[in-house]
Amino acid sequence: MINIGQDIKNELTRQERTVSWMARKLNCTRAAVYRIFGKNSIDTALLASISKILHHNFFQDLSDDIVIDE
């Protein structure tokens, strides 16, 4: 299972964006963004917002990680 918080942090870094930038976009504090980075799971509404501001489909990343045994 992927660590969604780490994936969000990696994408933010890849885009050369700052934590302050993300906090402004999410209308939250920098501390809240750092807490997001530490999460293994995340609220879907928050993930949708993050996906939109980073132009990255984190839902697809999660879906790609699912293995279904037949």
What are these regions (language model features)?
Residues N27-I42:
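Recognition helix of helix-turn-helix/homeodomain-like DNA-binding domains
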Residues M1-W21:
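A short, Lys/Arg-rich alpha-helix, primarily the initiator
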Residues T13, G38-K39, K52:
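Residue-level detection of the helix-turn-helix DNA-binding "recognition helix"
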Residues A45-D61:
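DNA major-groove recognition helix of helix-turn-helix/homeodomain DNA-binding modules
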Residues N10, R24, R35:
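DNA-binding alpha-helical recognition surfaces that contact promoter or target DNA
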Residues D61-E70:
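Short amphipathic recognition helices of helix-turn-helix/homeodomain-type DNA-binding modules
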